[in-house]
């Protein structure tokens, strides 16, 4: 048996929309597919979790063990990517002790807050990165492995750390491989903000050279 769903099987899952050349592992877990849109040339590997309101553009690779919790919305624009074991949260519970924690409790006993997470074009997120809700990772930014992203990230920058901080500018040479006319404008994508319960987080992997150079 093929490790990825066939085109016919993907159609039967019931996605809001799905493009061409999409490969999704049979070992991935898809919840609320009616709220998930996927573009062209996308690959989603083993043991990924996709839940909630998620918009995935085209030419995107989501590596193994990545979790996208889109209760309040997650948008991944074209040519972005996430490395293994990263998590993106669009909503989080209140850990102050004033409320119960988790989606199993009545709505009046929890305090969930968050907002849409937008991952712009050409963003690369390293392994074991945690992305908090209600932020934008700017076009072309790179996030080093094991980082915590809790604020907006400047475009075309290399970032790492807990919390993540800008290390230096990122080169744009990769653009020579892209025909600008082939890029989609996703700035008008609308993500409805509704949520009931649950907590969330996200991440991807960039070369460990970032850490090594910083230590040099």
Predicted regions, residues:
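Short, well-structured beta-strand-loop connectors
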Residues: 125, 143-145, 159-160
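Conserved beta-strand-loop-alpha-helix hinge in the C-terminal portion
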Residues: 156-179
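Beta-rich strand-turn-strand
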Residues: 118, 128-141, 147-150
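Flexible, glycine/small-residue-enriched loop-and-beta-strand segment within the central core
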Residues: 2-7, 26-38, 43-133, 162, ...
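Intrinsic low-complexity, glycine/proline- and repeat-rich
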Residues: 182-216
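Flexible glycine-rich beta->alpha loop in the catalytic core of nucleotide-sugar glycosyltransferases
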Residues: 86, 93, 136, 147-148, ...
């Amino acid at each position: 048996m093929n490790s990825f769903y066939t085109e016919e099987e993907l159609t039967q899952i019931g996605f809001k929309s799905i493009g061409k050349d999409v490969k999704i592992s049979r070992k991935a877990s898809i919840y609320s597919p009616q709220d998930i849109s996927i573009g062209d040339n996308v690959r989603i590997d083993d043991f990924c979790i996709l839940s909630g309101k998620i918009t995935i553009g085209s030419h995107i690779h989501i590596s193994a063990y990545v979790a996208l919790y889109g209760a309040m919305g997650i948008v991944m624009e074209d040519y972005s990517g996430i490395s293994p074991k990263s998590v993106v949260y669009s909503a989080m519970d209140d850990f102050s002790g004033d409320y119960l924690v988790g989606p199993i409790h009545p709505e009046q006993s929890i305090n969930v807050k968050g907002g849409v997470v937008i991952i712009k074009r050409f963003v690369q997120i390293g392994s074991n990165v945690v992305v908090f809700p209600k932020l934008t990772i700017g076009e072309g930014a790179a996030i080093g492995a094991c980082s915590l992203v809790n604020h907006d990230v400047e475009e075309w920058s290399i970032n790492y750390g807990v919390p993540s901080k800008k290390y230096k500018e990122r080169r744009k040479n990769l653009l020579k491989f892209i025909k600008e006319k082939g890029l989609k404008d996703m700035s008008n994508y609308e993500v409805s903000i509704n949520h009931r319960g649950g907590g969330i987080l996200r991440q991807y992997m960039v070369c460990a050279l970032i850490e090594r150079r910083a230590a040099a």
